[in-house]
Amino acid sequence: MKKITSLLIIALLLLSSCGSVPITGRKQILLVSDQEVLTSSLTQYSEYMKSAPVSSNASGKNMVTRVGKKIAAATEQYLKANGLSAELSNFSWEFNLVKDNQVNAFCMPGGKIVVYEGLLKLCSSDDELAVVVGHEVAHAVAKHSNERISQQLLTQYGA
């Protein structure tokens, strides 16, 4: 009986947590509120930026900011035109270039984007960088961080 009760609770939790990704409509499970994810990610982002060496490459920083602002504006325009403006209500875009030779970038929930200098060695134009930044922005808009946390919680509790 205890096992059946546990399964019913898990089933109800899963059903109540089902959602859809804006734009694509792909189904996802979000067990943690957007606000909880945002609060946690802003803390992590702040700690990361305190310890990360910010790049002194002025032209690289300008490129990251310029491209990031264009991607953010296009994202906002698209979501607004499709009645999805609320999806960005917790976003405050920020674009940073850090001194690191990794060929990588990441975007935290809320629109906090970090590009590593190593990536700029491969991106010779705004268009090339826009592909990467657009990809990172898509992760944030689709709430992939929340989805990943939810999947980890399910795994942790054996669902």
Regions picked out by a protein language model, each given a short descriptive name:
Residues I4-S6, L13, C18-A159:
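A Zn2+-metalloprotease active-site environment signal
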